[in-house]
């Protein structure tokens, strides 16, 4: 399972395992996660909507000659206020009460207008 951001993301990681993504209020970020829907996997994001807005949630199935339904899920977020905003993704399966896996991202958003005036 790979996770990437299509925005400027150097792969920095906090001591608690959270991946750090730096952005500005003007630039949305994308987080890509692999899902195997044949197994019933589904990534569920938890975040504070006062700090981040979810702009898109897309799924791209990987074509193959078999009945397996796996692919890449893309979540696109935009920061609505400056600061560090945590996004927790839990891989859920319909018949389980606990998460199969977790991914944590800290999105640090700066206000580009405050840089210009400084």
Features from the language model and the residues they span:
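N-terminal edge beta-strand
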Residues: 2-31, 36
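Short, solvent-exposed loop/linker segments at beta-strand-coil boundaries, enriched for Pro/Gly
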Residues: 39, 47-63
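Short, conserved beta-strand segments of beta-strand-rich sandwich/propeller modules, principally
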Residues: 30, 84-88
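Low-complexity, Pro/Ser/Thr- and charge-rich linker/hinge segments at domain boundaries
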Residues: 109-118
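Beta-sandwich strand segments
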Residues: 95-102
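Beta-strand-rich extracellular modules
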Residues: 90-94
């Amino acid at each position: 399972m790979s996770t990437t951001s299509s925005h400027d993301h150097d792969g920095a990681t906090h001591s608690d395992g959270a991946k750090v993504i730096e952005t500005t209020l003007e630039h949305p970020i994308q987080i890509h996660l692999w899902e195997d829907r044949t197994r019933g996997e589904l990534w569920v994001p938890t975040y504070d909507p006062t700090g981040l807005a979810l702009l898109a949630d897309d799924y791209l199935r990987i074509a193959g000659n078999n009945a397996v339904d796996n692919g890449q899920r893309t979540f696109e977020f935009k920061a609505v206020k400056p600061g560090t905003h945590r996004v927790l993704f839990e891989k859920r399966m319909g018949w389980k009460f606990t998460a199969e896996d977790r991914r944590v991202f800290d999105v640090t958003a700066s206000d580009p207008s405050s840089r210009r005036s400084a």
